[in-house]
């Protein structure tokens, strides 16, 4: 969701670009680390299942956050990256990808108000 907004990317980009899917996966792995610290068991197979789901989506499909970006609407980034960062701090897990995504999205949202 967040990566698609920052990249302006439809599902096709994640289906075809190793760089885009790698960035998405890096954000997901931060969530997995936090989940494990909280006693929630997420595994590599969960990421594999996400890729299987993603591969079946329409290449022209867009995440809700990308649609928000295109309409210059405030996003739900605080519910995504903001919460990941908060929980990362709680469990002493670094979240550099989600931190970067939050900063970029908040900066873009600020720019829309100018």
Locations of regions flagged by a protein language model:
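Anionic-ligand binding region
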Residues: 1-26
